[in-house]
UniProtKB/Swiss-Prot annotation:
Reactions it catalyzes: di-trans,octa-cis-undecaprenyl diphosphate + H2O = di-trans,octa-cis-undecaprenyl phosphate + phosphate + H(+)
Protein's membrane topology: Multi-pass membrane protein
Any single GO CC term annotated in Swiss-Prot or TrEMBL for this entry: plasma membrane
Assigned EC number: 3.6.1.27
A GO biological process held by the record: peptidoglycan biosynthetic process
Superkingdom of origin: Bacteria
Coiled-coil residue windows: none
Cited function: Catalyzes the dephosphorylation of undecaprenyl diphosphate (UPP). Confers resistance to bacitracin.
Note: Bacitracin is thought to be involved in the inhibition of peptidoglycan synthesis by sequestering undecaprenyl diphosphate, thereby reducing the pool of lipid carrier available.
Protein's name according to its UniProt entry: Undecaprenyl-diphosphatase
Length: 294
């Protein structure tokens, strides 16, 4: 991978990370088209740190409030009984606990299925299938859902279900935001609430995955045939951070006015295009280096 290709992939990451269209699927597809090979799970996870840093910058006030209120309640600022320590009556502390609960599924499944995630699940036929299926689900759920729940209405049950939706994004093509937004809309949350919860809930998962893959890349970069090198990876990460911040602003404005129908149609169209490219042999279903590792 050269630096121009890294810039392109950084742009692709920034444009698709927050939208319910699956950034990992786009990185996988564009990587194959430009490089002739899969950039790999490590590259994908590391450059996602860039887009998640943009999330932290944009939501910095919410994050500071969540952390200060959560720690304050935990250490007895609002009372010594367990309900007070769990954030009773404190919306930010409660949101902090909900984010923790919502992170449980992806942590368990991420560690349990790590080898499968990095090999078998990167098959583009799987990507095509989930692009199509979750595109239809997003379309139907968004059109039929109630729109009366806000972030203050979240329960631990809802948080866990949000987390299950997020954990589906371990499969390239599902989309982290697509999974959580679809679950959120099905549970009756407004579009704005579903998106904000999706952003905040992704922070622990993305940073955890990114830091884990960074450590692995540092240890194995000389022997990992798929890792494109630190120079291009860091360039892509910086590009994804800068452009990602702009995309967040635009996306939040978009969902306050429009439905997710356009994204659902895009997912279905992309699934058809990728399927055709697979059929005619332009794209391989599984990168040879991934197949060898499986």
């Amino acid at each position: 991978m050269n630096f121009f290709q890294a810039i392109i992939l950084g742009i692709v990451q920034a444009l698709t990370e927050y939208l319910p269209v699956s950034s990992s699927a786009h990185i996988r597809i564009f990587g194959d088209l430009m490089l002739g090979s899969d950039p790999g799970a490590a590259f994908t996870a590391i450059i996602q740190i860039g887009t998640e840093l943009a999330v932290i910058l944009y939501f910095r006030h919410d994050i500071i409030n969540i952390l200060t209120h959560w720690f304050g309640c935990l250490f007895g600022r609002n009372g010594k009984d367990w309900k007070a320590r769990m954030g009773r009556g404190d919306e930010y502390a409660t949101l902090g606990w909900n984010i923790i609960v919502g992170s449980i599924p992806i942590v368990i499944l991420g560690f349990t299925l790590q080898d499968v995630i990095e090999t078998s699940l990167r098959n583009l036929w799987i990507t095509v299938t989930v692009l199509l299926v979750f595109g239809v689900l997003l379309w139907v759920v968004d059109a039929k859902a109630r729109q009366n729940k806000t972030m203050d209405d979240m329960t631990y049950r809802d948080a866990f279900l949000f987390g299950l939706g997020q954990s589906m994004a371990l499969i390239p093509g599902v989309s982290r935001s697509g999974g959580t937004i679809t679950v959120g809309r099905a549970l009756g949350y407004t579009r704005e609430a579903a998106v904000r919860l999706s952003f905040l809930m992704a922070i622990p998962a993305v940073f955890g995955s990114g830091l884990l893959e960074t450590v692995k890349a540092v240890k194995n970069y000389k022997t990992d045939a798929m890792f494109p090198g630190w120079g291009p990876t860091l360039v892509a990460m910086v590009i994804s951070f800068v452009l990602g911040y702009i995309v967040i602003i635009g996306f939040l404005k978009f969902v306050s006015t429009f439905s997710y129908k356009a994204f659902a149609i895009y997912r279905i169209g992309l699934a058809v295009v990728v399927a055709l490219l697979l059929i005619v042999g332009v794209l391989p279903a599984i990168d040879p280096s991934v197949a060898a590792a499986a």
